[in-house]
């Protein structure tokens, strides 16, 4: 992405929700590289899909020659951002937050280049400046620059104040001051001139712009990316099992890949603009090709491949594709032990059984059939496969020959009802 028209290119992709003084920012970008930052609060032990758009936006700026600062909120994570939250957040211990800070910093690192010369990325932690600050310094040096009148009129806070069942604590109310000071601090330390974040961060970003101007007399800017919505109105980034995480131990690469494969036609081309680095011309050509092919669209596979590779690397992508292909064609011999571990983690329903269980009981225990009688009928009708092979004997007892890596057996009833058996060791 050329730096001179970067904002326009981001707008073409639908990646700009709001921007402060767009003309002045475009001029500043045209003059040469700037430093910019995005903050990630450790509210869990992993980032999720909602963090991916701003994180990739940092990467887009770095590719255009700018210097990204990834700020992990070791201090703000102890407080909790009230923005558009219906209720007060639960406070976590310092040890927990520090553990999450370390995990999130490691998660962010592969997306940015920390060794590429002048625009090498920087990792920062706001605990470095807040950890030793006393309350008097906070109130005198930061608090005096904030108007309570303006703070309570910010939309993110106003929504909480207007609820009869929920107020807002002074702790969460002060979050706005902390994030505002982050911007001023990073401006002084690293010359940061732009903050990016989700559109729910607009109030916090504008507070930081005002504070930086008051403390350092510098003009700085803010840009928000849209909160992603789906065409059908349902929440993006959620499955029946909850959030889709970037940590492979919380959401396996296979499950992650399948999430993107299942993207609706109405969303897929928009998501290619948000979550990949494909050129707009490529995306438009793919949309045209899909429209005229008369076949199932290819876009979902392109999207799944691109984003899984970005987040989980080539190895994670290959595993996800291998599992997908093996389940589709019924040939499980290509699967590795770690592939089965992914399936056991979250790839499909899983049940632990004692060795020596017969097939009818396994179908009942796995909830593929409601009773042994129904299980018998399904088996006799050739409707059940064991590891991809039809098993016609209702009295069949599952044995060691049916176990992959001495541990796993895959049952299927009909075409789409799966269950993975994990055999108990004793």
Swiss-Prot record:
This enzyme's EC code(s): 6.1.1.1
GO molecular function terms noted in the UniProt entry: ATP binding; RNA binding; tyrosine-tRNA ligase activity
PROSITE patterns membership: AA_TRNA_LIGASE_I, S4
Subcellular location: Cytoplasm
Span(s) of short sequence motif 'KMSKS' region: 235-239
This protein's UniProt keywords: Aminoacyl-tRNA synthetase, ATP-binding, Cytoplasm, Ligase, Nucleotide-binding, Protein biosynthesis, RNA-binding
Binding residues annotated for L-tyrosine, in chain numbering: 37, 175, 179
Primary localization: cytoplasm
'HIGH' region, short sequence motif: residues: 42-51
Pfam families xref list: SYY_C-terminal, tRNA-synt_1b
Cysteine disulfide links: none
One GO term of the biological process aspect: tyrosyl-tRNA aminoacylation
Range of residues in the leader sequence: none
Residue span, S4 RNA-binding domain: 357-415
GO cellular component: cytosol
Ligand binding (ATP): 238
Catalysed conversion reaction: tRNA(Tyr) + L-tyrosine + ATP = L-tyrosyl-tRNA(Tyr) + AMP + diphosphate + H(+)
Assembly notes: Homodimer.
HAMAP family for the chain: Tyr_tRNA_synth_type1
Function, in words: Catalyzes the attachment of tyrosine to tRNA(Tyr) in a two-step reaction: tyrosine is first activated by ATP to form Tyr-AMP and then transferred to the acceptor end of tRNA(Tyr).
Family classification: Belongs to the class-I aminoacyl-tRNA synthetase family. TyrS type 1 subfamily.
PANTHER family assigned: TYROSINE--TRNA LIGASE, MITOCHONDRIAL, TYROSYL-TRNA SYNTHETASE
Name of the protein described by the UniProt record: Tyrosine--tRNA ligase
Organism encoding this protein: Klebsiella pneumoniae (strain 342)
Taxonomic lineage from the root: Bacteria, Pseudomonadati, Pseudomonadota, Gammaproteobacteria, Enterobacterales
Designated gene of the protein: tyrS
């Amino acid at each position: 992405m050329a730096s001179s028209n970067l904002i326009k290119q981001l707008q073409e992709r639908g990646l700009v929700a709001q921007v402060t003084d767009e003309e002045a920012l475009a001029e500043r970008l045209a003059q040469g590289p700037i430093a910019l930052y995005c903050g990630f609060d450790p509210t869990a032990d992993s980032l999720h899909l909602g963090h991916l758009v701003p994180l990739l936006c940092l990467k887009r700026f770095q590719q255009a020659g700018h210097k990204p600062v990834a700020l992990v909120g070791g201090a703000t994570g102890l407080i909790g951002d009230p923005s558009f939250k219906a209720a007060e957040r639960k406070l976590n211990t310092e040890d927990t937050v520090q553990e999450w800070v370390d995990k999130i910093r490691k998660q962010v690192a592969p997306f940015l280049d920390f060794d590429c010369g002048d625009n090498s990325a920087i990792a920062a932690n706001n605990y470095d400046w807040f950890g030793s600050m006393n309350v008097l310094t906070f109130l005198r040096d930061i608090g005096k620059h904030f108007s309570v009148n303006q703070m309570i009129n910010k939309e993110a806070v106003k929504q909480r104040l207007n609820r009869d069942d929920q107020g807002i604590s002074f702790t969460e109310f002060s979050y706005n001051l902390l994030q505002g000071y982050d911007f001023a601090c990073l401006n002084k330390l690293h010359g940061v001139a732009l903050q990016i974040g989700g559109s729910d961060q607009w109030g916090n970003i504008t507070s930081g712009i005002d504070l930086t101007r008051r403390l350092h007399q510098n003009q700085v800017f803010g840009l928000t990316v849209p909160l992603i919505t789906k065409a059908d109105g349902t929440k993006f980034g959620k499955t029946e099992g909850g959030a889709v995480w970037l940590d492979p131990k919380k959401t396996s690469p296979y499950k992650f890949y399948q999430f993107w494969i299942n993207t609706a036609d109405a969303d897929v081309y928009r998501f290619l603009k948000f979550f990949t680095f494909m050129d707009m011309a490529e995306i438009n050509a793919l949309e045209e090709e899909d429209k005229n092919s008369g076949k199932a669209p290819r876009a979902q596979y392109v999207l799944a491949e691109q984003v899984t590779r970005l987040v989980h690397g080539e190895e994670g992508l290959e595993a996800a594709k291998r599992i997908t292909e093996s389940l589709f064609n019924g040939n499980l011999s290509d699967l590795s032990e770690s592939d089965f571990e992914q399936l056991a983690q979250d790839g499909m329903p899983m049940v632990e059984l004692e060795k020596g269980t017969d097939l009818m009981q396994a179908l009942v225990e796995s909830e593929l059939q409601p009773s042994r009688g129904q299980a018998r009928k399904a088996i006799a009708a050739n409707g059940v496969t064991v590891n991809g092979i039809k098993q016609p004997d209702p009295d069949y007892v599952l044995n060691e020959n049916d176990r992959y890596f001495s541990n796993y057996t895959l049952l299927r009833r009909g075409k789409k009802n799966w269950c993975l058996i994990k055999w108990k060791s004793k």
